[in-house]
Curated annotation (Swiss-Prot):
Keywords: Cytoplasm, Nucleus. Residues 174-184, 366-375 have a biased composition (Acidic residues). The gene is TAP46. Disruption phenotype: RNAi plants show severe growth retardation, the formation of spontaneous disease-like nectrotic lesions leading to premature cell death. The defective plants also display a strong reduction in protein synthesis, the induction of autophagy and nitrogen mobilization. It is found in: Cytoplasm; Nucleus. The keyword DNA-binding does not apply. This is PP2A regulatory subunit TAP46. The keyword Repressor does not apply. It comes from Nicotiana benthamiana. Belongs to the IGBP1/TAP42 family. One of its GO terms (biological process) is regulation of dephosphorylation. GO terms for molecular function: protein phosphatase 2A binding. InterPro entries: TAP42/TAP46-like_sf, TAP46-like.
């Protein structure tokens, strides 16, 4: 769409197209679409000013339902302007903040801003962290309430549309169209007022965020100007790019003349051990090397300075790197298998030996224990014999009771 056709478009069509671009910009759009949306919304602002839709002497009750949506034009333009990619980021931030302040100021004139926000702005902002936290919580609650209310209005409108359609299909009697139109008008006004309230909550949060970003960028720019490093970022990027390109070019050139040796893998070495061409204890060189990630490929495998150590830790994998190579793991398992086989052979030899012929050697304390057992056994036998010779009560038979 050219500039001429955009000027010929009516205001409702321009606003609808700009609001669609604003809604799609919340996810991801290209810069051409963002700039086009900014141009459309600027055209909307120009047409609103020419038509004189709003006046500073009016309030929200004086504005018609059809014109309420145009209050959101500066807010939409501020959010799209903030998403514009430009070398001068501070300039973009200032332009976006100007539109946000214009939107908030106009809403305050129309009595659309909550009293809590007005009190905070008149006091010069919340000073303590407790006040800032309370303000953010109250704003978050208003935002959630506005979102819930918009969803409720949408569902209510859909239900009424379905019921109206079903009633029209079931009965040929004409329904009261005036009541339906009145309900639609009230819902539309309520929806736009709620949308403006939601936009105010987001506008206050965005304005605070842009102010902090502008302060940080201004401080960085001032520091660079003081140190004479105006072109610091671009020069560093060019130097790093050149260094990386040189390293890859040299590596590609070396690859044509260097023939890598065939690596001794775990499988080939195990096959050599099985077939008798190598021993388990034989030392050999492992060709598997751990991967190098990120700037570690530039600083080398053994960083010396603290800067190189920090650079080598950038872009590391999210998982833990192996502590041993594949060959070392295979050798460890092979040693475990050899020990297990030797232990099984020893157990088989002990099982097949003449264990019944080999008298087990007695331990030093076993003889004393056997002697104690024999003495206790003799004592028990003697006591049994005495009880047989002297039954219970045998010595009291001749005694007479005392008279």
């Amino acid at each position: 769409m050219g500039e001429l056709s955009m000027q010929e478009m009516p205001l409702p069509a321009l606003f609808e197209q700009g609001s669609k671009i604003h809604a799609s910009a919340e996810s991801s759009v290209d810069q051409d679409t963002v700039r086009k949306g900014c141009e459309i919304l600027r055209q909307c602002e120009e047409m609103i000013g020419k038509l004189g839709l709003f006046s500073v002497n009016e309030t929200k009750e004086d504005i018609s339902t059809a014109n309420l949506k145009y209050i959101l034009v500066p807010y939409y333009l501020a959010e799209l302007t903030e998403k514009v990619a430009d070398n001068d980021r501070i300039k973009v931030l200032k332009a976006s903040q100007a539109k946000l302040k214009e939107f908030i100021s106009f809403c305050e004139t129309m009595e659309l801003v909550p009293e809590e926000e007005i009190e905070t702005s008149t006091q010069g902002g919340a000073n303590s962290s407790v006040d800032r936290r309370a303000k953010k919580i109250a704003r978050f609650k208003r935002q959630r309430a506005a979102e819930s209310k918009l969803l409720e209005i949408k569902e209510r409108k859909e239900r009424r549309g379905r019921s109206t359609k079903a009633a029209a299909l079931s009965s040929p009697v004409e329904t009261e169209e005036d009541d339906v139109l009145d309900d639609d008008g009230e819902e539309e006004r309520e929806a736009w007022l709620t949308t403006i309230s939601l936009g105010l909550c987001k506008a206050f949060d965005l304005l605070e965020m842009l102010k902090k970003e502008e302060e940080i960028l201004s401080a960085v720019k001032e520091k660079q100007l003081q140190n004479g490093e105006k072109e610091f970022s671009q020069a560093i990027l060019d130097e790093r790019t050149k260094k990386v390109e040189t390293w890859h070019r040299d590596a590609a050139a070396r690859a044509h003349y260097t023939k890598p040796a065939a690596p001794i893998t775990c499988a080939t070495f195990a096959q050599d051990v099985i077939e008798g061409r190598a021993k388990v204890s034989q030392a050999h060189e492992h060709k598997h090397q751990p991967l190098i990630f990120g700037p570690a490929s530039l600083v080398g495998r053994n960083p010396t300075t603290e800067r190189e150590k920090i650079a080598a830790q950038v872009f590391q994998p999210h998982y833990r790197l192996p502590t041993m190579s594949i060959e070392e793991a295979g050798l460890t398992e092979m040693n475990m298998m050899n020990e297990w086989q030797e232990r099984n052979v020893k157990l088989m030899e002990e099982a097949n030996s003449s264990w019944y012929k080999d008298a087990p050697k007695s331990r030093p304390g076993e003889d004393d224990e056997e002697d104690d057992d024999d003495a206790a056994q003799d004592k028990a036998r003697a006591w049994d014999d005495w009880k047989d010779d002297n039954p219970r009560g045998a010595g009291n038979k001749k005694l007479t009771p005392c008279g």
